[in-house]
Amino acid sequence: MLKSVTNKKLGKEGYIYVSYGHPKYLEHVVASVTTLRRYDTKRPVALACTKKHQDLIKKYGFEEMFDHLIDLPEKHASIVGFKHNFFNYLYFDKNIFLDSDIVWCKNPDTLWQSLDAYNFTITGNLVSDNFFGAPKSIGVAKDMLLLRRKRTLKRFGLTYLSRAQTGLMYSKDPALTKNVCDLAKEMLKRKAETHFQSRKMEKGRNEESCEWSLAMAMSKLNIPVYAWFQGQTSPQLDYIAFLTDHDDDFEYVKCKYYCNDFVYSFRGLKTNWIKNLLIKAFSIIPGKGDHMMVTPYCLHFGWYHEKQPFFEFSDRVWDELVSDQNSSKASLGLEDRSSNEA
């Protein structure tokens, strides 16, 4: 049942999504939750969303899809606005926060068990790759040659910088979560002192990134990331058409996973022939070409140039659900008319 809630615990374990802005983002959440319910029908799902999106949920009769509705103020209706303040939304004892452009691929029970070892964590890599906060093209070579990343770490007193991937965040410690968020805000204010490129410079992006600032905050507080790349037990993997086999409804998903992090980082390049060339070149070195076919818990459509299959899937799911609701209403109307005539 859909209902607004106040700041109190709503259960032991639960999922939290966020939705604001264009109605298509609500469609994405609906599609993601549909895939989650293939594997987990018990844990509650809360949606933090604006009033406009609440009205759309009620208009289309999707109340039963969410267990709880959380009012999202406009000041938090952005990537940075929400993820630098998500300590305000710990509505369960143990919380998994999810991006809307995620498809669930298998039962998450063992993922929950693994995350329980942490008070707070975000999926990521111990060492950030070459593309983290940098140009998503061959232009990243300039940052490498000029040692910009190294200078950023020295300036902020860091000895390492993890790669945070905030498509999946976990928390069961409100105080620690607030500390991370507050420090991330401070890091973002000092962006001019870093080598990071504004996310708005990427084609199709109109919001600033929260990831590098959260990663720097976690490094400063020495909080470990939850290993993003774990082979067969990976919590989430990027959707890369070049490396992913799947059916139209994403009920069958297999990702080609390169065991060497450096080789796997080539997935970020937009041009397939360049990716293929680099992978083949480095595969000459023993071990560099080792790979496996894996099914992650989540398939994340985080790369803008790889989102189209998810857009098509979410459109189809939304249209089918709306059609089902209309059919149900029509059937109820016929039953009521028959009863009155009788």
Language-model features: locations:
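N-proximal low-complexity "stem/linker" segments adjacent to membrane-targeting elements
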Residues: 1-30
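Short aromatic/hydrophobic "clamp" motif used to bind/position activated sugar donors
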Residues: 95
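Conserved donor-nucleotide/metal-binding helix-loop-beta segment in metal-dependent transferases, i.e.
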Residues: 106-144
